[in-house]
Amino acid sequence: TISPRGIDIVQLGGASDCPTVQNFIFVADVSRFVFAFGCNDYSSTVQDPMLIRWSDQESVTNWTPAATNQAGSIRLSHGSEIITCVQTRQEIVVFTDSALYSLQYQGSPVVWSSQLLGDNTSIIGPNAAVAASGVIYWMGVEKFYKYDGRTQTMRCDLLRHIFQDINLAQASQVFAGTNEGFNEVWWFYCSASSTNIDLYVIYNYSEDVWSYGTLGRTAWLDSGLRNHPLAATYSYNLVDHEQGNDDNVSGTPVAISALIGSAEFDIDDGDHFGFVYRMLPDITFRGSDAASPQVTMTLIPMQNSGSGYNNPISAGGNSTATVTRTSTSVIEQFTGQVYVRVRGRQMIIQIESNQLGCAWQLGSPRIDIKQDGRRGNT
């Protein structure tokens, strides 16, 4: 049994009009105020989910507004409840279930003022927002947002992948974290069939790139003064991220499965079939611990966009050999080029690895492709 170490502030000497119920408490370390969000009003025990109160500056006990102190309150109007807040250098950004507000310190007599930053927004849970490099990012119910002085909906290539496989009944478990060493924001969430966190999505705000994967984490703390980000697991371990090349959460190294794929590409907007006969992978294995690191590169053709992957017969007399359904090549440390025979109207490239100690970086792969018959040819 863990004994609580917290102290009810109403029991402290000099306590005055302290909130007795609230959605959450927030300490503004820059301005040195204590805030109660979604709390009861003065001389009342009824909770108001849209009310914000703050104590006198540098006081945790004095919540009674007076001409001689800076305690006060403000009620927000857009939304039905306050969900969370995020502090930046200039303001405290407050999220309701349908709007975004800014709280800014004004000094006496107003003390704190509110400004509506955006309406008709959403946030999926109380821990789904985070600040990185002066910008606030958060996961909404069906989309992602950011605030950099103005509220914006973010472009996300993975919206369908994420929101068609998420357990909204467990939305309160969603949490965000930063990995500023790699210019990333992470969100962890439960898949549609799980009540525990098992998926993540990453946004790289420097490159405007999204990625995703499977991982069970219950808490996340960026590196800060440490060398690596720290995360908590369901097996009650604290693990360093971005250290080493393998998954060592259990004490036994396990290879990390990695995969990246391109969008579909074609020639002449798909008016012609393309025949690929050579690829230059442009992959380096700098940082690998494996003696012979390698990845698998796969070229996958399609006869028509949306038709699925298939094996059309080569047309136009350009190929006298069997054209494979897909072309899979092992890329090793000194592989400069690989020869293939693949034909399709659209194609994608995939690179994947599942090897202990393997680390790799993808540059700008190139392919040699030529026309091989027009639309409708067989």
Where are these regions (language model features)?
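Beta-propeller and closely related beta-pinwheel folds
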Residues: 5-174
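Polar, enzyme-active/binding microenvironments
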Residues: 1-35, 40-45, 62-66, 76, ...
